[in-house]
Each structure stands twice: as C-alpha cells, then as structure tokens.
C-alpha cells in the first residue's frame, strides 16, 4: 500500500511539473508568434491580440484539467480502494 501511495505522489509531481512546463512553452510560442505577426502587419495587431487572448485562455484550460487529475490522485486515489478489496 505504501508503494502505491509513493508512486501516486511521484505521478502527481510529474503531472504538475509537466503541466507547468507545457503551459510555459505554449505561452512562449504564442507570445513570440503574436509579436512576429504584429511586427509584420501592425494594422492587424488588435485582431491578433484578441485571438491571442482567446488561445491563451484555451491554453490555460489544459493544465487545469491536469491539476484536477493530480488532485484526484492525491485525495481520492482510486488505486488504494483496489488494494483494500
């Protein structure tokens, strides 16, 4: 049982770390491409900015789902119930 709990803690740490890393890389690419597009066509910068914020919101939703899964493994681990039964 301790092995399952320790591996669950490691899995939660990996999930949270990869969520943070993926979001950081995604925002870096998104911001870089926005700046490239705004520098190339300055008259389209407001429209690109609106689209960038929409994509940024969607980009934030993915790690939130990962954090929910990590919290599930932390507080309501489904694998512990299988060991007890």
UniProtKB/Swiss-Prot annotation:
<keyword id="KW-0406">Ion transport</keyword>
<dbReference type="GO" id="GO:0045259">
    <property type="term" value="C:proton-transporting ATP synthase complex"/>
</dbReference>
<keyword id="KW-1133">Transmembrane helix</keyword>
<dbReference type="InterPro" id="IPR002379">
    <property type="entry name" value="ATPase_proteolipid_c-like_dom"/>
</dbReference>
<feature type="transmembrane region" description="Helical">
    <location>
        <begin position="53"/>
        <end position="73"/>
    </location>
</feature>
<keyword id="KW-1003">Cell membrane</keyword>
<protein>
    <recommendedName>
        <fullName>ATP synthase subunit c</fullName>
    </recommendedName>
</protein>
<comment type="function">
    <text>F(1)F(0) ATP synthase produces ATP from ADP in the presence of a proton or sodium gradient. F-type ATPases consist of two structural domains, F(1) containing the extramembraneous catalytic core and F(0) containing the membrane proton channel, linked together by a central stalk and a peripheral stalk. During catalysis, ATP synthesis in the catalytic domain of F(1) is coupled via a rotary mechanism of the central stalk subunits to proton translocation.</text>
</comment>
<dbReference type="InterPro" id="IPR038662">
    <property type="entry name" value="ATP_synth_F0_csu_sf"/>
</dbReference>
<dbReference type="Pfam" id="PF00137">
    <property type="entry name" value="ATP-synt_C"/>
</dbReference>
<keyword id="KW-0812">Transmembrane</keyword>
<dbReference type="GO" id="GO:0005886">
    <property type="term" value="C:plasma membrane"/>
</dbReference>
<keyword id="KW-0997">Cell inner membrane</keyword>
<keyword id="KW-0472">Membrane</keyword>
<keyword id="KW-0375">Hydrogen ion transport</keyword>
<dbReference type="GO" id="GO:0033177">
    <property type="term" value="C:proton-transporting two-sector ATPase complex, proton-transporting domain"/>
</dbReference>
<keyword id="KW-0066">ATP synthesis</keyword>
<comment type="similarity">
    <text>Belongs to the ATPase C chain family.</text>
</comment>
<feature type="transmembrane region" description="Helical">
    <location>
        <begin position="10"/>
        <end position="30"/>
    </location>
</feature>
<comment type="subunit">
    <text>F-type ATPases have 2 components, F(1) - the catalytic core - and F(0) - the membrane proton channel. F(1) has five subunits: alpha(3), beta(3), gamma(1), delta(1), epsilon(1). F(0) has three main subunits: a(1), b(2) and c(10-14). The alpha and beta chains form an alternating ring which encloses part of the gamma chain. F(1) is attached to F(0) by a central stalk formed by the gamma and epsilon chains, while a peripheral stalk is formed by the delta and b chains.</text>
</comment>
<keyword id="KW-0446">Lipid-binding</keyword>
<dbReference type="GO" id="GO:0046933">
    <property type="term" value="F:proton-transporting ATP synthase activity, rotational mechanism"/>
</dbReference>
<feature type="site" description="Reversibly protonated during proton transport">
    <location>
        <position position="60"/>
    </location>
</feature>
<keyword id="KW-0813">Transport</keyword>
<dbReference type="GO" id="GO:0008289">
    <property type="term" value="F:lipid binding"/>
</dbReference>
<dbReference type="InterPro" id="IPR035921">
    <property type="entry name" value="F/V-ATP_Csub_sf"/>
</dbReference>
<keyword id="KW-0138">CF(0)</keyword>
<dbReference type="InterPro" id="IPR020537">
    <property type="entry name" value="ATP_synth_F0_csu_DDCD_BS"/>
</dbReference>
<dbReference type="InterPro" id="IPR000454">
    <property type="entry name" value="ATP_synth_F0_csu"/>
</dbReference>
<dbReference type="InterPro" id="IPR005953">
    <property type="entry name" value="ATP_synth_csu_bac/chlpt"/>
</dbReference>
<comment type="function">
    <text>Key component of the F(0) channel; it plays a direct role in translocation across the membrane. A homomeric c-ring of between 10-14 subunits forms the central stalk rotor element with the F(1) delta and epsilon subunits.</text>
</comment>
